[in-house]
Structures are given as structure tokens and as C-alpha cells.
Design a protein with these regions (language model features):
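Alpha-helix capping and helix-loop boundary segments enriched in small/acidic/polar residues
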Residues: 6-13, 159-162, 183-190, 210-216, ...
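Core nucleic-acid recognition elements
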Residues: 9, 31-173, 186-196
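Terminal amphipathic helices with adjacent charged low-complexity linkers/tails
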Residues: 72-104, 338-339, 420-443, 448-450, ...
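Catalytic alpha/beta core of large soluble enzyme barrels
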Residues: 122-146, 439-452, 496, 500-501, ...
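Function-dense linear segments that define catalytic or interfacial modules
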Residues: 152, 166-188, 192-269, 273, ...
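Internal maturation/activation junctions in enzymes
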Residues: 216, 489-511, 536-627, 700-701
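Conserved catalytic alpha/beta cores of large enzymes that bind or transform nucleotide phosphates
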Residues: 272-282, 289-396, 400, 404, ...
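Short acidic, low-complexity intrinsically disordered linear motifs used
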Residues: 763-777
Length: 777
């Protein structure tokens, strides 16, 4: 039998080479070489290429993954990583780090900044720290993410220019590119070494824009962009342009369209009639979808709508597949913003009145504030004013529509506008927060975009405030003691703050926001794994979660204060609650006491005094994002974000990266994992999120889960969902992200015979990675 090598040379098939290779990829693992070989024999044919042999071996190993044999996921990952080594270097042994940087810089794949800011001696020293063997710790799901998404490559020719450990060290170097201006070169190298260690050992999670781009000539690294549309053609056009540009840079978009006037509203005193917000939003949607997220996938948007908008009955169902294409926005997701007043109306079963934004400017402004009593007074005035047009909707119909669309599509999100501002770190009178981002974890001020002519450059720019957020995560499953957070957070906050100064901004509105607030969003991954390791679940973890999260918050805030001491606070810090010494834990909801009594483990008065004296470098610091993708490359893989697992083995990934994913330490912790479809309701999860939100200055991508089997006749009562809404609001959650429905999923688990199927994540959930290039990480 003939085998065709990569260079076209034809050689005789040699089973001994296969056996030697299998011996290597199975070394130290509970995996059978003979089983892999026997399976792959069926896939090997005369004239097969070496690439296809590797693919046959990989597929064979992956097919053997089961609850009793999870190590085959690592075997499959090793096979793919071995293949990538040869594709990148032409040989199994990597080239020297210095030669790789020089070659890739010459080819234009790496930025010249690496060689300009580090000496050859420094690069050679860092080469001694690189552990290439760590590439063989990735499971197949993580290895595929590297192959398709993270490695610097020519996507046209299929040429690879690096392997994961090279990527990690380059990223670490880029994080501290100019650190020698603040520290000695020796101290800078220490920071780089720590960053590489945390990255390569899976302690850090960093987002796709960082991991895929930070070493290339492209200087755009923000995961999240939040944009606000004003009620004018100029503003809509400015948002259209901004959406298009940021989609090409790989950022997920959250676009606030809640201020657009309603359908049939008068324009220019009745000279024209408005066609409604839908068509303007569709234009923005098409602009973003026409662009690729940095070469990985089409742009993605969540549109954010006002819950009292006169077109609410339409906007709530824009995602509904039953709507005609011309009258829908099925390729985007939608968030409906409500407040405590609306929830009160629903509870009292009173009509809810909807308004046209231009007619009720004061009501609209008060909606995005914590001033509920003033809002209620203005609402009642508007209802009583016969000159103001309004639409009365029975509250039962209002909530049934909202709940039906949330359950039916899984992708109608909910936000609480009053809590968003009440529990923020910003002065809401000067910098209100109107909406969130693509994945509902960002809570930053924005302002209407408008075109502005810059006489110095003789070009038009976009004025207003575009909120950007750079993310980073810490894998709690890889941390044995919460005191470790202090060093981990110090290095990560330094790294991302450096990046805020290094990245370029296509619009002045974004550059201004960055200068004002320098926002960062540190999150959590591996939470479900952490619970399992500690023999906890989502119903009994509150005390330990509170202690760890308080430590996490303390470490992150201290790191930002230290940065403020060294580099100065962000420009807008005096317009934040930080300047008053008010911390996130100080503005917690009273109802949290029913979950766990508040206990302060640290001297928070010291923090308050230091904040008032030195300020903070970053006005926002913590945001808990989904981390769906990056969790798979944390060592051999960990659980994503703060989410529960849906099965012990799942099929996860985007269109090109679907692979079997096993939970960490499956055999040892098999009976400890809290499987979401065993839950009767979301109450324990909501309480867990509430404890985390207590210390989170931004928001949390909090999902809910609906299992129809828990209800009679498989019908989910609206009251069940409403009660969870009330619970989430009472405990201080700011947003609700996906609603995951079990009835659209196959949640079969693997058993020992390796024959049953893995859980196939529902289209809604599998698109989660496809649509969220940014904060899925």
C-alpha cells in the first residue's frame, strides 16, 4: 500500500511508524494503541496522504472517548498538535524562538514591535522558559480551536507560522511591550515570565482578539463594543459605519436602539411619517453581517430595546422564526430592558403603557436610572396627559409575550435598567448606562454617536461615547488557594492596562471612552469544575463562593489602585462612585442577606481610603462573561464561565471545531458534577449568580435553563419564569442572557461502551460560539 507524503513523495506504508507514533501520543495516558490502530485500519487506503492518516488516527481516537475512557480526548489532541508542528516548522522539533519571531516579522505575520522592544538576548532567555511539551496537554476540542482560530496562519494557503507555546510567549511579551519604561528590564522579564506561566498552565483565559491578534500588525483587541443610537439619520449613519468597522476587527456588538422613534411617528412636524425602528436596525444589522469578525466569522450583534417603547409588541418578536424575513431580524439577538416599576405592574396585573420616545424625553431619561419613585411619578403624568400618545397593553399579555419569545428562541435577553445604574460604579446623572454588549456582561456608559468634522485631519470622525471592554479570565479550577488571586490579578491587570494604551482606535468616541474610564472586565472560568472539586453544587456553595469572590474583588481592586499610584488614575474617575469611596459590595441588594449573611473578610476601609486618595486606574474591573471557547484551551480543558455542565461529555464547537469535550477529572469527579438537566428550577443558580454579582461592578452573562420534563404535560407555566424574573431582580442581577431549553437538545451521556452519543448542544447553544467571537473568548 502506497502513502503520499506532504512533499509529494510516494513511499510504502509502514505500520511500524504508526505504532511508534501511537506509542508517543498514548504515553502516560489510559489509552489503547491497538484499539486506535484497529479503528483506523478501516479508514486507511492505498494512495492515502500522511495528512489523511493523521486524520484517520485522530478520528479513531475521538470515537473511543467515553466516560470510562476520557483520555482519548488528549490522544486525539496530541495527534492534531503533532500534525500542526510539522505544518508550522516542517519538522516535529520547533525552531528557536528568535528565528520564529524574525521569520514571521519578515513575512509580515508578526508586528515589528517585538524585535524593536526586546533584545535578542532577552528573547533567547524567554526561549528557555517555553515548555513545548505543554502543547500535548490539549484535548481535541482545544486543539481544534488552536488550529482553526488562534494560531497565526494564512487562511488562504493553509500555512501555519507558530504553535501554541510560541503564541503564548509572544502574547506575554506584547502585554508588557513598554513595561521597561516603568520598571527595570529584569522586572519586565519577570512579568513576561509570569504571564507565560499563567497562560500556558491554563490559569488565565484571554479572549480571541488577544490570543489570535496580539503579536500581529493589527492593533485592535477589544472584545466588546457597546454603541448607542440617537434618534436622527446622522446618528443612525454613524452607528452603521461604526458597526461595520468593529465587525471587521473581531468585536462583538451591543447596539442600543431603544431611543429610535416608533412606527408611523411624525417626522419634521408631520411632513413625513417614520417607517419605524426596524428598518434602521436592519440596516445596521446588514452592515455588520456583511463583514467578517477578523476573518473568523460574520459580525454579530445584540440589539437593545426599551421595554416601554410603543413598538414593543413587534420588537419582542424580531427573532421569531415565524415572522416574514422582511419584517424580522433573525440573524441578530435582542435584549428587552425593563425595570422594577414594570415588574410591579405585572405583579399587580395592571395595564402597561407604551410610548414614543420623542414624546416622553424625561420618562426615557429616568428609565435609565435608579430613581424609581421619580420614574413612577413621570410615568403616571404621561399616562394622564391626553396630548401624549400611548398604547395600553395588559400586563399579562406583555409578560407572556416576553417569556414566550425568551423560551421559544432562547435568544431574547432581559436587562434591568434601574439595577444596571443603581449598582454601577459610575455617577448615573453624568454617565448613565443604557444597555449592555453582545453577551450581556458589560455595563459601561455610552452616548449617542454623531458625525463630527475634524479640522486638524480634515476628515469626519464619530463623536459621542463608544464603550470598549478588554476581557480576561481566571480559571478558578486551576487555583488551589484564593490568596493566589493577588499575584494573578496583579499581572493580568498590568497586562490588560498596558494593552489599553497600545491598541489603536478607529474613532475618537472610543478613544475618549478609553481615556476616561480604561475599563477592564476580569471574569471567571472553570466555576462548575471548582464546585465539583469542593464537593459543592449550585444550591449549597454560597459561603465558599462569597469568600472566594470577595477575595477576588479585593485582589483586583488593589491591583487597580496600585496601577493608579504608578501611572495615575483614569481621567474620569472623579465622576465615579470610587471617588466617594463607594465599592461594589457597598451597593449590594438587601435581599442577599436571605442567601448569606454579609461578612467582610478584609479591611475594606483601608481600600476605601486608598481609593479616595489615589483613585483607580480602571473605572470598571470585573465582568463575568461566557468563556465558551477559551475554556477548552485551559490546559486539557475546563468548564466555561460560571455555567453548569449539561453533560459529562458533550459535542462542542463552531462549524469547523465541533469535537467531543469531557469535563475535567471526569473519572474522579464524575459523581460530583452538578448536571443542569437534573435541576428542578433555576433558583439555586440565580442565588449563586447573585453572590457573584455582589462583588461584580459590571454584569454577568447569566443563563437560565428550562426543562419541560419538570412540568405537567411538558408545558412550562409562565408563572414559573416570572417568579425567576422577580428573584433575579430582587437579588440584584443586572442581566439575563440565554434561556437554554432541554427539549431542543440531545443530552445523552456517554457510558462505558462508548456507543451512546455525546450531548449535541442545541443550535442556540452551538451558535453561542459562532455568534460570540469576543466574550466567548
Amino acid at each position: 500500500m502506497i502513502v503520499v507524503k506532504r512533499n509529494g513523495l510516494k513511499v510504502e506504508y509502514n505500520p511500524e511508524k504508526i505504532n511508534k507514533f501511537l506509542e508517543f501520543v498514548c504515553d502516560g495516558l489510559d489509552a489503547s494503541m491497538s484499539d486506535i490502530a484497529m479503528n483506523s485500519d478501516l479508514l486507511i487506503y492505498d494512495g492515502i496522504t500522511t495528512d489523511n492518516i493523521n486524520k484517520a488516527l485522530r478520528d479513531s481516537a475521538e470515537s473511543l472517548i467515553s466516560e470510562n475512557n476520557p483520555d482519548y480526548a488528549i490522544v486525539a489532541g496530541r495527534i492534531l498538535m503533532s500534525d500542526l508542528r510539522k505544518k508550522a516548522y516542517g519538522d516535529f522539533t520547533p525552531d528557536s524562538f528568535l528565528s520564529i519571531i524574525k521569520e514571521n516579522t519578515y513575512l509580515g505575520m508578526y508586528t515589528e514591535d517585538l524585535l524593536a522592544n526586546y533584545t535578542e538576548e532577552e528573547i533567547e532567555y524567554l526561549d528557555t522558559l517555553i515548555d513545548h511539551d505543554l502543547d500535548f496537554n490539549f484535548s481535541i476540542s482545544g486543539a481544534l480551536e488552536w488550529e482553526k482560530k488562534y494560531l497565526v496562519q494564512n487562511r488562504v494557503t493553509g500555512t501555519y507560522f507558530e504553535t501554541p507555546q510560541i503564541s503564548y510567549m509572544c502574547v506575554a511579551m506584547m502585554y508588557f511591550l513598554n513595561e521597561d519604561k516603568l520598571y527595570s528590564k529584569e522586572e519586565r522579564l519577570q512579568y513576561v515570565a509570569k504571564a507565560y506561566k499563567y497562560l500556558s498552565e491554563g490559569v488565565w483565559n484571554i479572549p480571541t482578539p488577544h490570543l489570535a491578534r496580539l503579536r500581529t500588525p493589527t492593533r485592535a483587541f477589544s472584545s466588546c463594543v457597546v454603541i448607542k443610537t440617537g434618534d436622527s439619520i446622522d446618528s443612525i449613519s454613524a452607528v452603521d459605519m461604526a458597526a461595520r468597522r468593529y465587525a471587521t476587527l473581531g468585536a462583538g456588538l451591543g447596539i442600543h436602539t431603544g431611543d429610535l422613534r416608533g412606527k408611523l411617528s411624525p417626522i419634521r412636524n408631520g411632513a413625513a411619517i417614520n417607517t419605524g425602528a426596524l428598518y434602521h436596525a436592519q440596516s445596521i444589522e446588514r452592515a455588520a453581517l456583511s463583514c467578517s469578525q477578523g476573518g473568523f466569522r460574520k459580525g454579530s450583534i445584540t440589539f437593545h430595546w426599551h421595554g416601554l417603547h410603543k413598538d414593543f409588541l413587534d420588537t419582542v418578536s424580531y427573532k421569531n422564526s415565524a415572522r416574514p424575513d422582511a419584517d424580522s431580524m433573525k440573524h441578530s439577538d435582542h435584549a428587552i430592558w425593563i425595570n422594577g416599576f414594570i415588574l410591579h405592574k405585572i405583579r399587580k396585573n395592571e395595564d402597561i403603557y407604551l410610548f414614543d420616545p420623542p414624546e416622553v424625553p424625561k420618562l426615557w431619561k429616568l428609565f435609565y436610572s435608579s430613581k424609581l419613585s421619580e420614574f413612577a411619578k413621570e410615568y403616571n403624568r404621561c399616562v394622564a396627559d391626553p396630548k401624549i400618545n400611548k398604547v395600553a397593553v395588559p400586563s399579562s399579555r406583555y409578560i407572556e409575550l416576553l417569556v414566550a419569545e425568551r423560551i421559544g428562541t432562547g435568544r431574547v435577553y432581559i436587562g434591568f435598567a434601574d439595577t444596571l445604574n443603581e449598582k454601577s460604579t459610575y455617577n448615573e446623572d453624568k454617565y448613565p448606562i443604557f444597555s449592555s454588549n453582545l453577551c450581556m456582561e458589560i455595563a459601561l456608559p455610552t452616548a449617542d454617536l454623531e458625525f463630527k468634522y475634524d479640522s486638524t485631519t480634515e476628515k469626519y470622525d464619530v463623536d459621542g461615547l463608544i464603550a470598549l471592554c478588554n476581557l480576561g479570565g481566571i480559571n478558578w479550577g486551576a487555583v488551589s488557594n484564593p490568596n493566589e488571586f493577588y499575584d494573578i490579578a496583579d499581572v493580568m491587570m498590568n497586562a490588560i492596562d498596558n494593552l489599553l494604551s497600545y491598541q489603536e482606535h478607529p474613532f475618537g468616541a472610543a478613544k475618549r471612552h478609553n481615556s476616561l474610564f480604561r475599563p477592564i472586565g476580569l471574569g471567571i472560568t472553570g466555576f462548575a469544575y471548582w464546585l465539583a472539586k469542593n464537593n459543592l453544587n449550585y444550591n449549597n456553595n454560597y459561603e465558599l463562593t462569597d469568600y472566594w469572590m470577595q477575595t477576588y474583588s479585593h485582589a483586583v481592586i488593589k491591583a487597580s489602585i496600585e496601577l493608579a499610584k504608578k501611572r495615575g488614575p483614569c481621567e474620569g474617575w472623579l465622576d465615579t462612585k470610587w471617588a466617594e469611596g463607594v465599592l461594589p459590595l457597598d451597593i449590594r441588594k438587601p435581599a442577599l442577606e436571605s442567601i448569606i449573611s454579609h461578612k467582610e473578610y478584609y479591611d475594606w476601609d483601608e481600600i476605601r481610603n486608598e481609593v479616595k486618595k489615589y483613585g483607580v486606574r480602571n473605572a470598571s474591573m470585573i465582568a463575568l462573561f461566557p468563556a465558551e471557547t477559551s475554556a477548552k484551551i485551559s490546559g486539557s480543558g475546563t468548564t466555561n464561565g460560571i455555567e453548569p455542565v449539561r453533560a459529562l461529555i458533550q459535542s462542542k464547537g463552531g462549524k469547523e471545531t465541533v469535537a467531543k469535550f469531557t469535563v475535567p477529572e471526569l473519572i474522579r469527579l464524575k459523581d460530583k458534577y452538578d448536571i443542569v438537566w437534573d435541576w428542578k428550577n433555576n433558583e439555586g443558580y440565580i442565588k449563586t449568580v447573585a453572590v457573584l454579582q455582589k462583588y461584580t461592578d459590571q454584569a454577568i452573562s447569566a443563563n437560565t435553563y428550562t426543562n419541560r420534563k419538570n412540568f405537567s404535560n411538558d408545558k412550562v407555566p409562565v408563572t414559573s419564569i416570572i417568579n425567576e424574573l422577580y428573584l433575579a431582580y430582587a437579588y440584584g442581577l443586572k442581566t439575563l442572557y440565554y434561556n437554554n431549553n432541554q427539549d431542543t437538545m440531545d443530552t445523552s451521556l456517554y457510558n462505558g461502551d462508548a456507543q451512546t452519543k455525546a450531548e449535541v448542544v442545541e443550535p442556540v447553544a452551538s451558535e453561542e460560539e459562532e455568534h460570540c467571537e469576543s466574550c466567548s473568548l
